[in-house]
Amino acid sequence: MENRDSVASLLLLLLLLPPPHTHQGQVLRHVVPTQNSQDSPARYLSNGPGQEPVAVMTIDLTQMSKPYSSFEFRTLDPEGVIFYGDTNTKDDWFMLGLRDGQLEIQMHNPWAQLTVGFGPRLNDGRWHQVELKMSGDSLQLWVDGKELLCLRQISGTLANNSWPSMRIALGGLLLPTSSLRFPLVPALDGCLRRDTWLGHQVHLSPSAPNLGNCDVDLQPGLFFPQGTHAEFSLQDIPQPRTDPWSFSLELGLKLVDGSGCLLALGTRTNSSWLSLHLQDQKVVLSSGVEPKLVLALDMGLPLQLKLDILKVVLSQGPKTEVLGASASRLAALRTLWSHPQGLLSLGALAGDNSSASFCLSDLWVQGQRLDIDQALNRSQNIWTHSCPHSPNNVSHISH
């Protein structure tokens, strides 16, 4: 390897070599390099909302042995960070990620400042092989055996003859998202496996944390494992119609298991002014002391909740139930949208002993799709773009 090969141009090749390190006080996944051919377990790339990586390593570049790396990854998520690397966050960093399902490289160093999106959409839930190779001052990238990218003249002469150290972050960033050349949502609901980095295979230790959805057959969707939740401010989502007043939402339920809260409208101090609970493959609508409604669920049909000044309606396909709420209760519900702490909650409520888990194909509010990335807060274990493929998988998933 010539000394003209810049640090930044090697960032695609170097990842997760030992020893383990910590980032922002958290203990990150421990990895062990080996030389054998046995496959290591797939790694889940998401560490929840935000930009926190799942692992951070500091690498001595004098220890690299081969200018070649490869890995396989799969995702249904169209956007997020696969990995980031730097020698310093100000003027020498690199990012490989996805945007609109396509690979994207962002690079900032003294010799090259660029953003390149390329190749086919890879967020199809299938495993894709990525290979990376340095040749002189050029970087070549293959996907599934086809060369998709060659970057030239992205290196320069180093200030000294020794390689500096480098930080590598998997599934996240070590600089503010706003410092990217073209900001994106860092969290990526995806997995990586069969990775070889400069001649080393990296294996998780037996004490490594949960592997997310990497050992489950997937389908597109939004999955709430048992005990997880998300909250949206009512002021940040599409607003009710005003003349006459009405509000509607629609949930595309694919899978449900267990019992517990599905959805609630309320505040911080009273989270369930109106709620939908899952119970034995049925949904129960309740509002305070008013009589409850029970509707048997039919998977595949959208579940609709509509409120107006006269009634609350729950429907699915041809089935419709009307909640016999009082005029004063309906008037109180309407005040939620002017309450500074008005919330739409999905999943388990605080203090709720919920065993429910469920998969949504879509969530629509006032005819507009609601993005989980817009949540005020959410559990880190929510799968933002994938669900178990079979109902048999749901009850066996633990986070």
Curated annotation (Swiss-Prot):
Subunit relationships: Homodimer.
Signal peptide boundaries: 1-29
Keyword flag rRNA-binding: no
Protein localization: Secreted
Organism field: Phodopus sungorus (Striped hairy-footed hamster)
Gene: SHBG
Task of the protein: Functions as an androgen transport protein, but may also be involved in receptor mediated processes. Each dimer binds one molecule of steroid. Specific for 5-alpha-dihydrotestosterone, testosterone, and 17-beta-estradiol. Regulates the plasma metabolic clearance rate of steroid hormones by controlling their plasma concentration.
Superkingdom as given in the UniProt entry: Eukaryota
Keyword set, alphabetical order: Disulfide bond, Glycoprotein, Lipid-binding, Repeat, Secreted, Signal, Steroid-binding
The name this protein goes by in its record: Sex hormone-binding globulin
